[in-house]
Swiss-Prot record:
The keyword Hydrolase applies. GO terms for cellular component: extracellular region. The gene is C1rb. This is Complement C1r-B subcomponent. Belongs to the peptidase S1 family. It comes from Mus musculus (Mouse). Ca(2+) 2 binds at residues 141-142, 144, 166-167, 170. Residues 463-703 form the Peptidase S1 domain.
């Protein structure tokens, strides 16, 4: 027993302090716990937690010799230079002063636990053994900002001059608006030179309001809110700034600026009127001198979305879509025009228009105007013209014109079933385009009228040797010179129907003419006059593929087309002939006319002549060829005309001209044949290319111009 006491004395000492490591939690026990503690001992355990925390201590086991007033053995708890209690006994015993479940709390970060034992533990002569105690401690946050009237530990009470903010393990200080925290982190000094307010509403006041404001201030309170908002200011009572009865604001003054303008300088005891600044940026400058005891000012600022003026149309044709009772920042409106009118921004035509309300309360673009759509001058019509149905010269929306062709030489091409009343009528639409109800934007076409001479030949008797033609008798007649004089007939307004052998003649020992000089004359019955009119350049020469130049006696496929470089202008002496469409044009005895500048009496006439001939019997023509011992093929692509008894026929120079027959049912003239070949001049029958058999080929080559 004595050895045990010696060891304890050596470890703890009779009197001494035990410093526990600084931790956030831990446990404290009596010496040798849970074995009985030694006698005659006094130790102090120092519990320390980090700064900014307090110490909380709770006993879980407590078995210390009980005594009246805990005079023998005891545990004493101290903190903040105060004794929190002196305890002995057992936790559940009424003897002594046990701590029970009480929590002990320090105000600072340190707590002292002193354990004292006397020289013995006897009770009525019997030695008693006590286990001592087991306690747990932990660090809890210290609210440095809380009022601590009982704290006596120096430096514990925070010294924030204005505002104190607690956090776990510490605190920090801040200042009222208009003051600046000093380097000591606790004291505040007036500083209001750059106060900024960005909330959409709030309060702004002078320092210490409603207490007297400090002297020598140079304050700048800036309100900056989102673009598109406007700030409203409402001053509250009391309003009190030093002033003078005779001089305006000589001492202290409040100045208000917005949009670069001074909205006023205020002082005295009359609060300013409510102000709508029409700006999202407002500055309040507050200056004070070195003296005075006025209470200052306070205002409540609010914001609302800035408004733009109501849009107004500049003319009666402008339509503002879905107008609103008011327009605010970022709102927009769209504008259209009444049908037939065009949006115009200056001189620029617009497809659409939208204006947006800007942050400064203005529209981002000016209101446009609506100008009536103008379709412009109608296109000129080839071989036709137009007239105004509505006011002459007016080409704007709903104006109407009517195209017409130069009749009787041209007629307007229309689709099947189209209305006669709407033919050629075009109206200026709301889109600014001339349109026909049936044809749309497509321009009308004036097509040549075929087979309608204004002065048709009326001779009914046969004429021996032919006779001169009068102007307009055969307006389709063409005079060609390639290797010699020849004839042809006008188809449409740019094609010449002729015989292939006039271009590639069947001369022995002559190669194909690959680049003939082809001259075409049109529009007169007099040779001198027709040449004065000038020749028409040829763009293309098209020979039928069945034609064989190298076979001198074979006139199969003796047909050709000349495409002129330019269309000719039709008139009374220049009209096309029609193409046949049935076999009735080839009946025996049917009379036809052949015209040309062919040889008469071994000379070329100076005037167009014609002859009236009947379609001959095919078998008679074939027998006549046999009598002449002519072996030239007389195919189904040919026919013959004439009468050997009267010695009428086409002659040299007439080749390529056409055999013209009048269709009495339709009152048109048709080219049923082309002067092709024969034996001599006026000695019997003449042979012609049968045009009906080549109509499909002709139409194919002419395309949409046939």
């Amino acid at each position: 027993m004595w050895l045990f006491a010696l060891l304890v004395t050596l470890f703890y000492g009779v009197e001494g302090s035990i410093y526990l490591p600084q931790k956030l939690y831990g446990e404290v026990t009596s010496p040798l716990y849970p074995k009985p503690y030694p006698s005659d001992l006094e130790t102090t355990t120092v519990i320390t937690v980090p700064m900014g925390y307090r110490v909380k201590l709770v006993f879980w086991q407590f078995d210390v010799e009980p005594s009246e007033g805990c005079l023998y053995d005891y545990v004493k708890i101290s903190a903040d230079k105060q004794t929190l209690g002196r305890f002995c006994g057992q936790l559940d015993s009424p003897l002594g002063n046990p701590p029970g479940s009480k929590e002990f709390m320090s105000q600072g970060n340190k707590m002292l636990l002193t354990f004292h034992t006397d020289f013995s533990n006897e009770e009525n002569g019997t030695i008693m053994f006590y286990k001592g105690f087991l306690a747990y401690y932990q660090a809890v946050d210290l609210d440095e900002c809380a009022s601590q009237p009982n704290s006596v530990e120096e430096g514990l009470q925070p010294r924030c001059q204005h505002l104190c903010h607690n956090y776990v393990g510490g605190y920090f200080c801040s200042c009222h608006p208009g003051y600046e925290l000093q380097k000591d982190g606790q004291s505040c000094q007036a500083e209001c030179s750059s106060e900024l307010y960005t909330e959409p509403s709030g309060y702004v006041s002078s320092l210490e309001y409603p207490q007297p404001y400090p002297p020598d201030l140079r304050c700048n309170y800036s309100i900056r809110v989102e673009r598109g908002l406007t700030v409203h200011l409402k001053f509250l009572d009391p309003f009190e700034i030093d002033d003078h009865q005779q001089v305006h604001c000589p001492y202290d003054q409040l100045q208000i600026y917005a949009n670069g303008k001074n909205l006023g300088e205020f002082c005295g005891k009359q609060r300013p009127p409510d102000l709508d600044t029409s700006s999202n940026a407002v500055d309040l400058l507050f200056f004070t001198d070195e003296s005075g005891d006025s209470r200052g000012w306070k205002l409540h600022y609010t914001t609302e979305t800035i408004k733009c003026p109501q849009p107004k149309a500049l003319d009666e044709f402008t339509i503002i879509q879905d107008p609103q009772p008011q327009y605010q920042f970022r709102d927009y409106f769209t504008v259209t025009c009444k049908q037939g009118y065009q949006l115009m921004e200056g001189n620029q035509a617009l497809l659409s228009f939208t204006a947006v309300c800007q942050h400064d309360g203005t529209w981002h673009r000016a209101m446009p105007r609506c100008k009536i759509k103008n379709c412009g001058q109608p296109q000129s019509l080839s071989n036709g013209d137009f007239r105004y149905i509505t006011t002459k010269g007016v080409t704007t929306y709903e104006a109407s014109i009517q195209y017409h062709c130069h009749e009787p030489y041209y007629k307007m091409l229309t689709r099947a079933g189209s209305s006669e009343s709407m033919r050629g009528i075009y109206t200026c639409t709301a889109q600014g385009i001339w349109k026909n109800e049936e044809e749309g934007e497509k321009m009308p076409r004036c097509l040549p009228v075929c087979g309608k001479p204004v002065n048709p030949v009326t001779q009914k008797e046969r004429i021996i040797g032919g006779q001169p033609a009068r102007p307009g008798n055969f307006p389709w007649q063409a005079f060609t010179t390639i290797y010699g004089p020849g004839g042809g007939a006008l188809l449409g307004d740019r094609w010449i129907l002729t015989a292939a052998h006039t271009i590639y003649p069947k001369y022995p020992n002559k190669g194909k003419n690959t680049n003939p000089r082809t001259l075409v004359f049109l529009g007169h019955t007099n040779m001198e006059q027709i040449q004065k009119l000038g020749h028409h350049p040829v763009r293309r020469v098209i020979i039928h593929p069945d034609y064989r130049q190298e076979e001198p006696d074979n006139f199969e496929g003796d047909i050709a087309l000349l495409e002129l470089e330019n269309s000719v202008t039709l008139g009374p002496e220049l009209l096309p002939i029609c193409l046949p469409d049935n076999e009735t044009f080839y009946g025996q005895g049917l009379m036809g006319y052949v015209s040309g500048f062919g040889t008469t009496g071994n000379r070329i006439p100076f005037h167009l002549r014609f002859v009236r001939l009947p379609v001959a019997d095919r078998e008679a023509c074939q027998r006549w060829l046999w009598t002449k011992k002519d072996t030239s093929p007389f195919s189904q692509n040919m026919f013959c005309s004439g009468d050997p008894a009267v010695q009428q026929d086409a002659c040299q120079g007439d080749s390529g001209g056409v055999f013209a027959v009048r269709d009495r049912n339709r009152d048109i003239w048709v080219a049923t044949g082309i002067v092709s070949w024969g034996i001599g001049c006026g000695e019997g029958y003449g042979f012609y290319t049968k045009v009906l058999n080549y109509v499909d080929w002709i139409k194919k080559e002419m395309g949409d111009e046939n």
